[in-house]
Amino acid sequence: MSSNNVPAPRRKCVGVKVGSVMIGGGAPIVVQSMTNTDTADELATVQQVEQLARAGSELVRITVNSMEAARTVPAIRARLDDMDCHVPLVGDFHFNGHKLLTAYPECAKALAKYRINPGNVGHGKKRDEQFSILIEMACKYDKPVRIGVNWGSLDPEMLARIMDENARSPDPLGASQVMHKALITSALESAARAEELGLGRDHIVLSCKVSGVQDLIAVYGELAAQCDYALHLGLTEAGMGSKGIVASTAALAVLLFKGIGDTIRISLTPEPGGDRAREVIVAQEILQTMGLRAFVPLVASCPGCGRTTSTYFQELAESIQIYVREQMIIWREQYEGVENMSLAVMGCVVNGPGESKHANIGISLPGSGETPVAPVFVDGQKTVTLKGDNIAGEFRVIVDEYVRTKYRKKVANA
């Protein structure tokens, strides 16, 4: 039993190898994302996959919905490998996946995992046949499968069966509970059928996606208690901007705190012209804020108030945040553990010095109306006071020096 302020131990589950990435089995929680390009557009898809991988996505899902898309997948994989981008690709199949995987074996081989929605692989006998073909292809090419159930596309026959059973029950469930049961039943029955067809438990990941925060928490709590498959977490559509971030964080934080979840995806609606990689950064920040993984040094900064020199303080905090994320591309390759470094950029003398001492490196500005004079604290000790017009640049030099001297340099592979 965990204490009230410590996350529960991770739920034990069967590990699933996806290319070079392990999901579940005690492995770190995996961050993944999905492209929104037409997969038949090779160049656009390669560029976006590379962008997402560079941002930190450890798996990238691509839509495979047409003959043109299926034909293009091997070329996408080859071009990414030529760019030294080896992120595993997951094929997202709906309606016609059985045909595409059968007709294009090179596509089947190039993908590291298949995503199947049991609610849209046909109905009745066709559903059984088409689902069987998908699983047989996964077995043939030794590929893991995510059986991804979605409340917007539940198998109508299965849903009708559960509703009929509920209607005959002396203690019937409410509508939302029936939906939860249907999602879980679809996932578990599909997984059991996949095993009957020869797919190992170590090749199966499950997800039951909904849009409501409370629904997601309830469904995954029940699903986690009923199986030991690896679980993929995420709202099916979180929304745009702050709403999407808040909804995803509210749902996933509760489940992750309970030890539930082996891979996550934040399904944000991009703003027009927005950066697709934002969903990757949000996923990383959720995990890092909860102490479950570390990706980049955390920069703590106060919100500002009437005591802060707002513009200068905000510009300094932003510049350090951007600098650290950009430098991590280099630091990650050169220094062990640098992602655990903590920084603080504080705006005034009320809490600034104290907060700065809690970080590995902290800087505290004096406050509103005063000439910028900023003491810097390194591992709790005041080391220097920065003045003048280049405080940000001098602080970056201090951060660089700290990284070089405090973190062990990685040994290059022989």
Curated annotation (Swiss-Prot):
Pathway this chain belongs to: Isoprenoid biosynthesis; isopentenyl diphosphate biosynthesis via DXP pathway; isopentenyl diphosphate from 1-deoxy-D-xylulose 5-phosphate: step 5/6
Cysteine disulfide partners in this protein: none
Alphabetized GO MF terms: 4 iron, 4 sulfur cluster binding; 4-hydroxy-3-methylbut-2-en-1-yl diphosphate synthase activity (ferredoxin); 4-hydroxy-3-methylbut-2-enyl-diphosphate synthase activity (flavodoxin); iron ion binding
Alphabetical UniProt keywords: 4Fe-4S, Iron, Iron-sulfur, Isoprene biosynthesis, Metal-binding, Oxidoreductase
Residues annotated to bind [4Fe-4S] cluster: C302, C305, C348, E355
GO biological process: isopentenyl diphosphate biosynthetic process, methylerythritol 4-phosphate pathway; terpenoid biosynthetic process
Cofactor(s) the protein needs: [4Fe-4S] cluster
Annotated cofactor note: Binds 1 [4Fe-4S] cluster.
Domain of life (superkingdom): Bacteria
UniProt catalytic activity: (2E)-4-hydroxy-3-methylbut-2-enyl diphosphate + oxidized [flavodoxin] + H2O + 2 H(+) = 2-C-methyl-D-erythritol 2,4-cyclic diphosphate + reduced [flavodoxin]
Documented EC number(s): 1.17.7.3
Family per record: Belongs to the IspG family.
Role description: Converts 2C-methyl-D-erythritol 2,4-cyclodiphosphate (ME-2,4cPP) into 1-hydroxy-2-methyl-2-(E)-butenyl 4-diphosphate.
Record protein name field: 4-hydroxy-3-methylbut-2-en-1-yl diphosphate synthase (flavodoxin)
Originating species: Nitrosomonas eutropha (strain DSM 101675 / C91 / Nm57)
